[in-house]
């Protein structure tokens, strides 16, 4: 995932609204595609377990679910290098193409091993999509709209996972899991439109010294020449790794950094653990396949809407209090799913679980970004997100391990609820930044890939 920073990490262009909306919509759709790719695993888990040809165990399912997430971990380390070479536009298009093709491979896989390899390769592309999409969204948004547009763009992940659940309900019974997976290749149809309609990053063109092309693009997009000329004279600074390390692990920040990393790992473990196993857990609670997938749909829908709502709440109550409270609500809801309840009550609990996991995690990224000073903010947040990927890989394995040991389904909910509480405690123990809060840029978030 891209790292967040303040406006120092991106030039403050003021494009016309039509350009902002175009970039926002295109980037949102790429994140929807990414959400489908990752979320489809949870949708097909019950069908994979029932596949008589593969005869998979829960541990094998967990490993297959972690394959794409391991790919994102590896791919994320090469994002900045590739972005510097080809630009954010081509990086985004290349990543969309790669993970879409991998969905064809996974859908046609003759063995679980080939399926896992295809998912891993797709993960390499997934590691770059959010980075490039977020960077372009922020760059082509006016400073006062960057927070909102980032939240709208990032909500595409939940809508993509929601789409996978809806398609699963419609086609799993009649067409099987291979068809549902292969539909993840549909974004290939959008690649020509991305080439034609998505603008390249002006920051990238300026940094590469391609000033004439940057000027032509700025004219086409309706950006004032004076803005471009000012940014050509004042290129973005690139902080050294040493400077970032000293900020992140300074005497004042070291304990807070550890707490933030623990919170990120714990939160992401809940997100990917429930995202992978929730339908199967609800089947074990006595629901049929269609109903169990509807729980995943509710989980993802509530998380998408919850992230935006929680962002608004944090403006009034404060970010740290909101995050801690959100995780506590999520933990209570998740643990309450272990108690046999009616259908409507379970829908409410699952909605609160989505609100108190993915929704809160979206706000947590902003909290982490604003914890550090401007020169280290982008890289420091990227490091936290990178560490969090270990939670993404371990989440599916936790559910797999408990299932393989024959544990009652309730223990899955208790385990993920406990992880949410760990995230809440870690954020609660994080002290306020040692530097003046007056320096924080509450109104503008930007991303650097």
Segments and roles (model prediction):
Residues 1-449:
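Transmembrane-helix signature of 12-pass secondary carriers
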């Amino acid at each position: 995932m891209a790292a967040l920073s303040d406006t120092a990490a991106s030039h403050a262009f003021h494009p016309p609204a039509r350009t902002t909306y175009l970039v926002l919509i295109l980037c949102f759709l790429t994140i929807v595609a990414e959400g489908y790719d990752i979320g489809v695993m949870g949708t097909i888990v019950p069908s994979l377990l029932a596949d008589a040809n593969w005869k998979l165990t829960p541990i094998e399912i967990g490993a297959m679910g972690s394959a794409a997430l391991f790919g994102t971990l590896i791919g994320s380390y090469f994002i900045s290098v590739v972005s510097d070479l080809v630009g954010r536009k081509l990086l985004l298009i290349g990543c969309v193409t790669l993970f879409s093709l991998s969905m064809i491979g996974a859908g046609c896989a003759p063995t679980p091993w080939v399926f896992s390899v295809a998912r891993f390769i797709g993960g390499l592309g997934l590691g770059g999509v959010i980075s490039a999409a977020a960077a372009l969204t922020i760059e082509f948004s006016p400073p006062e709209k960057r927070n909102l547009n980032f939240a709208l763009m990032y909500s595409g992940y939940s809508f993509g996972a929601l789409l996978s659940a809806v398609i699963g309900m419609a086609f799993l019974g009649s067409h099987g899991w291979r068809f549902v997976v292969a539909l993840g290749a549909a974004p290939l149809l959008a690649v020509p439109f991305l080439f034609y309609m998505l603008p390249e990053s002006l920051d990238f063109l300026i940094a590469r010294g391609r000033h004439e092309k940057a000027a032509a693009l700025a004219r086409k997009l309706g950006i004032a020449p004076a803005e471009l000329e000012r940014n050509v004279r004042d290129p973005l600074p690139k902080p050294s790794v040493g400077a970032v390390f000293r900020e992140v692990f300074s005497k004042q920040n070291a304990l807070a950094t550890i707490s933030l990393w623990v919170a990120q790992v714990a939160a992401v473990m809940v997100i990917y653990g429930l995202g992978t196993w929730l339908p199967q857990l609800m089947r074990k609670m006595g629901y049929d396949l269609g109903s169990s997938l509807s729980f995943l749909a509710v989980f993802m829908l509530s998380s998408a809407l919850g992230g935006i709502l929680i962002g608004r709440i944090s403006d009034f109550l404060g970010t740290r209090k909101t995050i801690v409270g959100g995780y506590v609500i999520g933990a209570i809801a998740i643990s309450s799913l272990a108690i046999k309840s009616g259908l409507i009550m379970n829908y409410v609990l699952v909605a609160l679980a989505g609100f108190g996991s993915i929704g809160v995690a979206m706000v947590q990224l902003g909290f982490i970004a604003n914890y550090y000073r401007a020169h280290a903010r982008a890289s420091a947040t990227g490091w936290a997100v990178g560490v969090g990927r270990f939670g993404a890989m371990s989440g599916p394995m936790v559910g797999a391990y408990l299932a393989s040991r024959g544990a009652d389904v309730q223990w899955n909910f208790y385990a993920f609820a406990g992880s949410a509480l760990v995230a809440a405690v870690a954020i609660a123990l994080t002290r306020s930044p040692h530097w003046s809060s007056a320096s924080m840029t509450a109104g503008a978030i930007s991303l650097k890939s």
